[in-house]
């Protein structure tokens, strides 16, 4: 059934206005984002098809623009809207997660980052900015791709820390393979960042590697003692 054929009280947009967003199903919320359907298919039909692409709604964020464009009824404009909505939801979730979290152990970092990073299909490099009490004040995602010591430049990392008047930083990246063994590039990157941090007076407290529900701390592994 087309949405314009529904009774007024059954239409997703009108239901949201009357009863609030929490009263809507995932399909209805996606249908509102999609706005319109295509010939023979309503936005609700397309939303149902979209949900079939992943096992959970949280995993929708894994869909690229090209993945979304493969779904009939989703063009570039709709794909961009969806990606923006997924990213905004992720950022809101991350902001609430990081609110006044104090880092006292590498496992604290893993707890913060595991759900966000363990299923990423590419390597991402994140800088956590901390104040003098080791409370995370901000996270900065600075790189996506294959980690290489020549790509992760200390200037980019520490510019953020200086701009935010951070006392110290912790860097985090993921291994899509799930194996958290540090590579030579991981170790080289760590040494470069630690050396620059010592010069600037902004301590690199740790480098955490996130894998499949496990992690490695390069501090605990002894690399900061060398």
UniProtKB/Swiss-Prot annotation:
Residue numbers binding Zn(2+): 173, 175, 186
Motif JAMM motif positions after renumbering to this chain: 173-186
Biological processes annotated in GO: proteolysis
InterPro entries on file: MPN (IPR037518), RadC_JAB (IPR025657), RuvA_2-like (IPR010994), UPF0758 (IPR001405), UPF0758_CS (IPR020891), UPF0758_N (IPR046778)
Keywords attached to this entry: Hydrolase, Metal-binding, Metalloprotease, Protease, Zinc
Domain of life: Bacteria
Keyword Metal-binding applies: yes
PROSITE patterns xref list: MPN, UPF0758
Any Pfam family the entry gives: RadC
Molecular function GO labels: metal ion binding; metallopeptidase activity
Residue span, MPN domain: 102-224
Family per record: Belongs to the UPF0758 family.
Protein name: UPF0758 protein SE_1336
Species this protein is from: Staphylococcus epidermidis (strain ATCC 12228 / FDA PCI 1200)
């Amino acid at each position: 059934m087309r949405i314009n054929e529904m009774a007024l009280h059954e239409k997703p947009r009108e239901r949201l206005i009357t009863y609030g967003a929490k009263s809507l199903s995932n399909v209805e919320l996606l249908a509102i984002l999609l706005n319109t359907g295509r010939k023979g298919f309503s936005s609700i039909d397309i939303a149902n098809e979209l949900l079939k692409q992943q096992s959970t709604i949280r995993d929708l964020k894994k869909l690229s623009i090209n993945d979304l464009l493969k779904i009939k009824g989703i063009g570039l404009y709709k794909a961009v809207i969806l990606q923006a909505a997924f990213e905004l939801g992720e950022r809101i979730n991350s902001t609430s997660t990081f609110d006044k979290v104090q880092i006292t152990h590498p496992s604290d970092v893993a707890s913060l980052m595991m759900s966000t990073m363990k299923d990423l299909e590419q390597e991402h490099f994140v800088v956590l900015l901390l104040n003098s009490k080791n409370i995370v004040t901000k996270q900065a995602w600075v790189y996506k791709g294959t980690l290489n010591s020549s790509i992760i430049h200390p200037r980019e990392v520490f510019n953020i820390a200086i701009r935010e008047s951070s006392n110290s930083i912790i860097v985090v990246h993921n291994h899509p393979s799930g194996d958290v063994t540090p590579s030579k590039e991981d170790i080289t990157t760590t040494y470069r960042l630690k050396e620059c941090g010592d010069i600037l007076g902004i301590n690199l407290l740790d480098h955490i590697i996130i894998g499949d529900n496990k992690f490695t701390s390069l501090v605990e592994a002894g690399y900061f003692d060398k």
